[in-house]
Regions:
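A cross-taxon signal for low-complexity, glycine/charged-rich
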Residues: 3-14, 20
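Bacterial N-terminal signal peptides
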Residues: 20-33
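Sec/Tat signal peptide C-region and signal peptidase I cleavage site
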Residues: 34-38
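Extracytoplasmic substrate-binding proteins
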Residues: 39-42, 102, 112-185, 206-208, ...
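A short, structured surface patch at a secondary-structure boundary
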Residues: 41-108, 112-113, 202-205, 252
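Short secondary-structure boundary segments
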Residues: 47, 67, 107, 182, ...
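Short helices/loops that flank or line small-molecule/ion binding pockets
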Residues: 92-100, 120, 216-226
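His/Asp/Glu-enriched short active-site or ligand-binding loop at hydrolase and phosphoryl-transfer sites
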Residues: 192-214, 234, 261-263
Length: 291
């Protein structure tokens, strides 16, 4: 499950962009380095997933900026909390203008923006896109410690683990399941979604196929595998699009009589945060449901 990207590029390019940023830094009085504080006073996130962790783990006064994506309720778990927070498209000049003590980025954040911020002396924490629950714990811990709230990160991890440890009694034989997302994308072995499926008591049939961690799965193959549970995206806002039309295919509607449909809103497991537990609950309920 690739981490969501904000589609950002750095403002300005080459030496000209660097000179403009340096001038802006001089004007703001940020070019001189200062001793690191125990907790950065102003933190700007330029990644959807670190937006959520910053808002959930940081003090409100620390949240100096997030991405514009976090203000959209369709794809953000913290849209309400993000309203009123300065939002950027991740351009380096926008970020510098918010006077950050720390910037949170991610694997899919514009490398040009990250490089330019570092060139002018802005500290950047580059979070990863975890593919395992251990990786999720590590990234929560990394961000929490970076913003000076390691204790809150540990509390978030403990609550996530508590919810992921709920007793589950899947029916036997274990239900065979497949994830089908827009454009036919699915989740195979080595993905975070695969680990959640298996933990919930489901057999991921994609593991029986030669499919990348995240790859495309033909609809006909889904039907031919004899699945018991089909996991699709929950309702998406906006008009119908070609990417989602396959989820309305007549063949899938016919499966309704013998296949349980589990709808998981994409934002629940797009990022590595506490809402993963909500996605897990949907999967576990499907695993326990009678035929």
């Amino acid at each position: 499950m690739p981490e969501a990207s904000s589609g950002m590029t750095a403002g300005g390019d080459g030496h000209g962009g660097f000179r403009r940023l340096r001038g802006l830094l001089l004007a703001l009085g940020l070019i001189a380095s200062a001793p690191a504080a125990a907790a950065p006073a102003r933190v700007v996130s330029i990644n959807l997933c670190t937006d959520e962790l910053l808002i959930r783990l940081g003090d409100p006064s620390q949240v100096a900026g997030v991405t514009w994506l976090s203000t959209l309720s369709a794809g953000s778990n913290v849209a309400e909390e993000a309203r009123g927070v300065p939002a950027t498209h991740g351009f380096a000049e926008q970020v510098i203008g918010l006077r950050p003590d720390l910037v949170l980025a991610g694997r899919y954040t514009s490398r040009q923006s990250v490089a330019m911020l570092r060139r002018v002396g802005v500290p950047v924490v580059d979070a990863d896109a975890p593919r395992t629950l251990d990786g999720v714990r590590a990234e929560i811990r990394r961000v929490a410690e970076a913003i000076g709230h390691g204790d809150r990160g540990e509390a978030m991890i403990a609550e996530l683990d508590r919810r992921l440890s709920r007793p589950i009694t899947p029916r036997e034989p274990r239900p065979r399941a497949a994830v089908l997302r827009p454009n036919g994308f699915s989740a195979g072995p080595g993905s975070l979604i695969d680990e959640l499926l298996r933990r919930a008591g489901l057999v991921n049939v994609v593991a029986e196929l030669e499919l990348d961690t995240y790859g495309q799965l033909p609809l006909e193959l889904v039907i031919a595998k004899g699945i018991d549970v089909l996991i699709v995206d929950g309702e998406r806002a906006g008009p119908p699009a070609m990417a989602t039309e396959m989820l309305r295919h007549p063949a899938l509607r016919k499966l309704g009589d013998r296949v349980r449909i589990a709808a998981v809103p994409p934002k629940l497991w797009t990022c590595y945060g506490p809402r993963l537990a909500d996605a897990f609950d949907i999967l576990a309920d499907a695993a326990e449901a009678p035929r």
